[in-house]
Amino acid sequence: MSLKRLAIANLLGAATALLMASSAMAAGETLTISGFGGNLQKDLRATLWQPAADAAGVTLSEETQDGLASVRVQVQSGSPTWDIVHLGADECAVGGKEGLFEPLDYKVIKTDGFDKKAYGDHWIATNTYSVVLAWRTDVYKDKHPTSWKDFWDVKAFPGRRALSTYPQEMMEIALLGAGVSKDKLYPLDTKLSLEKLKEIKPDISVWWSSGAQSAQLLKDKEVDMMAIWGSRVASVIKDGAPVEFTYDNGILGYGCLAILKGSTHVAAAQKFIAGVVSPEIQARIPEMMPYYGPTNSLAFKVGKFSPEVLAKSNMSPENVAKQTFIDANWWRDNNELVREDYSLLISN
C-alpha cells in the first residue's frame, strides 16, 4: 500500500472512530425534563417526549415542577439539575425575558407550520389546550348557554358558575362576554375585563385552582356552568356526567418547552426539542391526546385522522377557527400587574 493510500486509510479510520465516539456520547447523554406531573406529563411522555428522545438518541429523566418560581431556584443555583422545562407559554415568555433560558437554535428546530405567536427566542410551543364553556345538561335542558355573553347573562341563564383563580384566559373570556370580537382581543382592555369580572363575581360560586378541582365541581353538580380546560371536561363526560361543552369562543393556550440557562446538555436538548415539534411526532397528538392539539399545523398533513378524532381535537381546522390564541408575549409584558389586580378582585 502506498504511503498516500495508507494516509487516507488512517484518516478514514480516525474519522470513523470519531463518528462512533460522537454517537456513543450522544447515546449516553441523559436529559432531565421537568413538567407538571400527573396524567398530562404521562401523556406527553408517551406521545411526544419519548419518541423525540429515541430519535435524538438520548435517555430521558423526568422531574416535576410547580411553575416559574421553581425554575428560578434551579437557574439561580448556578448548577441546574434540569435541562428542559415544560410550562405554559406565558411563563415561558416571562422566563425568557428574565434570562432563565438558553436561546433556541432555529437552524436545528424548524418552525414550518407554526403560528408566529407559538414560539419565541427562548421557547417554543409543543402542545395546545383549550379553555371552554361547559354546562350541565340536566340543569339547562331546553336552552343552554352557547357563548361567554350567555355566561354573563345571569337572568337568561341563572345558575352557579365557576372561574379560575388564574387570570390567564379568564381576562380574555371576560372581554368576549362584553362583546369584544375574538380577533380584537389584544392588547387586552384590562379595565373593561376587570369590570366584567366584578360584575359576574356575585354569581361565581367557586374560583377553582386546579384541573382536578374544576372537573370535580362539574361532576358533583356543585356548579352548573363554568370555564374549564377541554381535556378536563372531556373526562367528566366520559365518566357519564350529563355535561356538554363548546369550542365556540374557546381560548387556545400553549404548553411550551425551554432549555434552562446553565444546562450542560444544550446541544442534545435542542435536538430533542426539534423532534418534539416535528410534524411526524406532532401528528401523534390528535389520536393519543384527545382534546389537546399539535402546535405544528403540518401534523394534519402528515397524519390521517378519522372524523371522530378531528371532532375532538382543538386544533382541527374546524375547531381552531372557532377559537382564539392566547398572546404569550402580551402576558410576558403585563403578567405581574394583571395578576395582582385579578387576585385582589377575586379575594375581596
Label for each model-derived stretch:
Residues Y129-V131, K191-I200, I237-S263, K304-E308:
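Periplasmic-binding protein-like
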Residues E318-N348:
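Conserved C-terminal helix/tail region of periplasmic/extracytoplasmic solute-binding proteins
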Residues F36-R45, P80-W82, H86-K219:
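Extracytoplasmic ligand-binding site segments that recognize negatively charged/polar headgroups
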Residues D90-G96, K219, D224-P242:
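A ligand-binding cleft/hinge motif common to bilobed small-molecule-binding domains
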Residues A27-V94:
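Early extracytoplasmic/lumenal segment of secretory-pathway proteins
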Residues L260-V320:
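Mature extracytoplasmic/periplasmic domains
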Residues G95-P103, D115-D121, S235-Y247, E308-A311:
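Ligand-binding "clamshell"
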Residues V132-V139, L175-V180, Y254-V266, I273, ...:
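A bilobed periplasmic-binding-protein/Venus flytrap-type ligand-binding module shared by bacterial periplasmic
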